[in-house]
Curated annotation (Swiss-Prot):
Cleaved signal peptide residues: none
Family (UniProt): Belongs to the sodium:solute symporter (SSF) (TC 2.A.21) family.
The protein's name in its UniProt record: Cation/acetate symporter ActP
Function: Transports acetate.
Topology in membrane: Multi-pass membrane protein
Transmembrane segments: 33-53, 77-97, 103-123, 148-168, 183-203, 206-226, 262-282, 303-323, 355-375, 404-424, 428-448, 464-484, 493-513
Superkingdom assignment: Bacteria
An annotated GO cellular component: plasma membrane
Keyword Transmembrane on entry: yes
The keyword GTP-binding is assigned to this record: no
Taxonomic placement: Bacteria, Pseudomonadati, Pseudomonadota, Gammaproteobacteria, Enterobacterales
Name of the gene: actP
A GO MF term: acetate transmembrane transporter activity
Amino acid sequence: MKRVLTALAAALPFAAHAADAISGAVERQPTNWQAIIMFLIFVVFTLGITYWASKRVRSRSDYYTAGGNITGFQNGLAIAGDYMSAASFLGISALVFTSGYDGLIYSLGFLVGWPIILFLIAERLRNLGRYTFADVASYRLKQGPIRILSACGSLVVVALYLIAQMVGAGKLIELLFGLNYHIAVVLVGVLMMMYVLFGGMLATTWVQIIKAVLLLFGASFMAFMVMKHVGFSFNNLFTEAMAVHPKGTAIMSPGGLVQDPISALSLGLGLMFGTAGLPHILMRFFTVSDAREARKSVFYATGFMGYFYILTFIIGFGAIMLVGANPAYKDAAGALIGGNNMAAVHLANAVGGNLFLGFISAVAFATILAVVAGLTLAGASAVSHDLYANVFRKGATEREELKVSKITVLVLGVIAIILGVLFENQNIAFMVGLAFAIAASCNFPIILLSMYWSKLTTRGAMLGGWLGLLTAVVLMILGPTIWVQILGHEKAIFPYEYPALFSISVAFLGIWFFSATDNSAEGNREREQFRAQFIRSQTGFGVEQGRAH
């Protein structure tokens, strides 16, 4: 377990979705016309889907959840498409390329949050909620305070993710396509807004499904060609890789990346519980018809992602053989052109030529679009459904709520483009780590305890949730990444890079303490309502109509 956690800790920079796929300065490449043509085909096709979806979006349910008509298999593919990022593909294969076996430990460790979602969250979440996870958290608690907290937690996570995605998208596209950074950021922002604005969840779902299929096909082809090169023998694969890698046989030894078990444990908890608190992932469970389909969604998604991460392991070792030992992919200093994160892209060229390189480059761009579309819809629903329709203007009509949601999409898109430009040369690696920490420290404890702990009260959820959120933010600021590397101080006040271990503990302890000491009449009433909520969560009685929060 210690080896797993230490590998996880070292690998977080590779997990920063598209943001960390390319970090620091990049060398702009010649214009890749094959990639641009393939990407244009993808854009035209998905815009056609958006037009088709726009004709079917007639209600709030259609816009937020595609009318609940997505099947478990389709939703599983869409979840995989939402979760498998550009850096999952480029970053993990790069980790295998540089560190060998530790990359496999990390890629499998990336899945540890999904059993929690499958066994503890998916079924009850679908039975209790309608559009956002705040529907579940506020089921028996006070609507206003809980929805404000849930919306704030969602928006902070979405904002951090969006900034990271936009910066990563600009740098990645500049490297792969030869396009100007600013043009790339604007292009991603405009396409993102079009998908969500006109097609809602239905268009977003199909963009994610198409992206997942393309990514799985591309990775499968690369892995197949690598295995064909070694006669479909893993022994030959590892032997040839060890023969050409600078570390030799050491690449087959796990646990050599970091020596700090506290940071490793903190990161492991952040990734595990943070996955179960990501608003754009949780929102996908409301797109299916019932709890059975929700469980099937997680089952299929976990299968697709597990298969994908195994492929990245083969791709990483293939890159060691076919890219690392080939001087054509090195610069004058002997380093990989574009950095180690480009190992998979160079391998695409090695096994499939320029045409397949163009395909993989286009898939990387499509990957970013699928993720930012899901994030934008989650952020818009938090504003329009949780804040506008249930806090600031109760009783708002569906038309008014949808209008606010679409305005929010435009605002989020413009803000994402502006911040993507402003953060071009900034270190944004910490943002995804902070997003996971906040999701794990604020969203996850409230969701879990609202469904499973009968003694939870509004006071406990509010105080504990805000404490968890603020603790994660403050400790991240005081830690080595921001306090030393960005702000330039000599020594960090908080010695660990990842705050999740401490902020999650603060959140759970705060929720428990302030709920246990809540003797108010309102608190007692909320405890008494747990039984009715429990029955609903187990049986799904009334789920077809949903609760009108």
